[in-house]
Amino acid sequence: MKLEVRKARAAAIAANLAAQAAVAARELLEEEPSAWEVGDAAYWLCRAAQKACESAADTLDPEEAETSADVFVAHLIASSAAQEACDQADELVSLAEELNHEIRR
């Protein structure tokens, strides 16, 4: 398996875990509204994972994706995971706005 494919798959796994962390952070914030240090960290984790997936997907050769199932699937899962991480980060932004919180670095 090509290095670029392995990197894309690894980035997708990281992004999926970041998205799960964001869900857990939102659940925690429902119980403990002052726990924004966790929410803030989950937001930035999702954004970093999203960028990593997008970058890894961009390194894959689109022409090779037409003929190689490994490359095609790696691009698909990296793109999907990037979108999920983005969606979960956006959910945290919505919650922050609802609770009048500014997400911090």
Give residue spans per PLM region:
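Long, low-complexity or tandemly repetitive, helically biased scaffold regions used
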Residues: M1-R105
